[in-house]
């Protein structure tokens, strides 16, 4: 496919984006808004953002959800801007500096919350800065400007949603159904690999792919939830399926690890049974029926606990899968599965990374302020706005540098494109609303195609071009003002990129160490006799951390294996029949406190000291288990955990 070719699957969204822009433009001028540009810009960003992220037409609900986030972020930013102006109107410089800190604070929060919700906080940060900068000549008009901005943005969002609904958005339901079938087959094939106990690298690749696919399925669930309320039952089932899928991965990998020391536990009966290849979900269904008969015949005591647990989880997965596909009423058996353990939310391991993002945003905004005041440039304010936009949006993504480069390319492309519209097209079409709408529809159509291809600079070019062409009421054509705006955008993006390069993010290793220590803490916390604590479901949170570890350290198999071993230890200890008495309960609390100290330690010396203390406590705990005559189901996993911590103590404590 050529660089300028248009694929059939890209046309519908390109028309949708063009429609959203035209609707926003028409409504903006019809209601005599002072700056319809904001409505058009909002419609374009809300519609194109999810398409750029997805690399194609976004699924139903994505545009609507992004629109709601933009409304929330705008209102938070407007309120914050009003509060800052009211409190500091007599000290303009201090007011702008506080706004810079506010933008950094919002970036810090956006780095810690869920990635899909971080957009609202990033927007809240730079919205307040836009308001404070814009009202500098006439501060008394602040409330009016805030209300107008909110109104224009809401109009733009409504237009984007209307265009989305008009062109029958894609439903993700069929993709979810197909993935559920395919995922079950992949789970069975992973168990086959683990029972064969073949090449470790092949097994590592297989479970790593399954972790990614399960995480992707969770993302699909979020999209389905946004799509329509009629999928509420499917959403509940998918949430439980996420835990079941992770349980299947854990039991398969534990089956592999058990054979490293005790291969005789997996009998020939099960080895022969899992030799049968499967290709479809129907094949897996037949095999599971046979497997349940084999277990009923051999008895639970003669069946390895990992295989028994795996079959139970796969059966529940299969039952819920049928419910998701048919979206029928939840029956009593399903309700019993869905009334599972409460999920545990873990503290973010990226606090240092979030603080780096805070300083990047704050310093870049302050640098823009100094540049504006020092040069006295009329478009210094525009440069400041672009700095805030780039840093607020780039920091929450895995590669901020590439986002900044995308904005630089986009603003450079917007200069000649905007020049064409400013000098030729808009002056010749402003007398006719129809011609003006057609001209902007053409812009939206072709850039909509490029956005879906994720062309570098396409998203930045769309936003920057709309931002600099004259879409005010009334239209005024001052070339110097246009040139200042275009150059201000470019300078702002370059300054933001410079700060991102200068303020290095060296938090990767620290984040990795914190993640590994959180796995250790989770394994230690599983040693408890508290009934409520034992019922807590840590599995989704642990695998979410594992997924983050895989993204931070791609290809680092020793780290992944260590993390997976800790997850397996947690699951095994969680179900272990630990003797119930006050002596052990008190010692469990002591070990949890020590594990928390390991995570929160600021220096390597403190971390080593607390980790050494944890190892000593594990030795004492094993002695206590012998005194209280704990069964092998308890002593063996505790012994394995202590051995793992001794083996990897340097990786878990040293920077």
Curated annotation (Swiss-Prot):
Gene (name only): aaeB
Function comment: Forms an efflux pump with AaeA. Could function as a metabolic relief valve, allowing to eliminate certain compounds when they accumulate to high levels in the cell.
Membrane spanning residue stretches: 13-33, 38-58, 69-89, 93-113, 121-141, 152-172, 370-390, 407-427, 431-451, 459-479, 482-502
GO CC terms, sorted: plasma membrane
GO MF, one example: transmembrane transporter activity
Entry annotated with the keyword ATP-binding: no
Induction: Positively coregulated with aaeA and aaeX by AaeR.
GO biological process assignments: carboxylic acid transport
Family to which this protein belongs: Belongs to the aromatic acid exporter ArAE (TC 2.A.85) family.
Protein name in UniProt: p-hydroxybenzoic acid efflux pump subunit AaeB
Species assigned in the record: Escherichia coli (strain K12 / MC4100 / BW2952)
NCBIfam families, sorted: PRK10631.1
Xref: InterPro entries: PHBA_efflux_AaeB/fusaric-R, PHBA_efflux_pump_AaeB
Location(s) in or outside the cell: Cell inner membrane
Keywords: Cell inner membrane, Cell membrane, Membrane, Transmembrane, Transmembrane helix, Transport
UniProt KW Transmembrane keyword: yes
One matching Pfam family: FUSC
Main location: membrane
Topology relative to the membrane: Multi-pass membrane protein
Taxonomic path: Bacteria, Pseudomonadati, Pseudomonadota, Gammaproteobacteria, Enterobacterales
